[in-house]
Amino acid sequence: MAITKDDILEAVGAMSVMELNDLVKAFEEKFGVSAAAMAVAAAPGAAGAAAAEEQTEFNVILAEVGANKVGVIKAVREITGLGLKEAKDLVDGAPKPVKEGVDKAAAAEAKKKLEDAGAKVDVK
């Protein structure tokens, strides 16, 4: 019996974040592709209009851990809801995004928690 799209979607839906990460890496290696978002070239006139609009989605990026690594891991767990191992892996891999596509208030709150823990944070 052949595997259907629904079977695949059901299997992917049951995976944890770490399992999905491993799956993406396996796809990248097997097919020689990248899961990174492709940049779309903007029209010359659109660049000025885009700059005039206020940014509504922000990415909180852990730039440097600092001296209090344990405190930063606790802050990452609180912000993201990740398990201990996943949060430690994220902190060990800095610079890495902690939250992506969040509003300004959530980005500011996450930045404050991480900086209070001793980390250096960028919001983009």
From Swiss-Prot:
Annotated Pfam families: Ribosomal_L12 (PF00542), Ribosomal_L12_N (PF16320)
Recorded GO CC terms: cytosolic large ribosomal subunit
One Gene Ontology biological process: translation
Chain's role: Forms part of the ribosomal stalk which helps the ribosome interact with GTP-bound translation factors. Is thus essential for accurate translation.
GO terms for MF: mRNA binding; structural constituent of ribosome
Annotated NCBIfam families: L12
Record protein name field: Large ribosomal subunit protein bL12
Keywords for the protein's UniProt record, in alphabetical order: Ribonucleoprotein, Ribosomal protein
Assembly and binders: Homodimer. Part of the ribosomal stalk of the 50S ribosomal subunit. Forms a multimeric L10(L12)X complex, where L10 forms an elongated spine to which 2 to 4 L12 dimers bind in a sequential fashion. Binds GTP-bound translation factors.
SUPFAM superfamilies for this protein: ClpS-like (SSF54736), Ribosomal protein L7/12, oligomerisation (N-terminal) domain (SSF48300)
Family note: Belongs to the bacterial ribosomal protein bL12 family.
Species: Cupriavidus taiwanensis (strain DSM 17343 / BCRC 17206 / CCUG 44338 / CIP 107171 / LMG 19424 / R1)
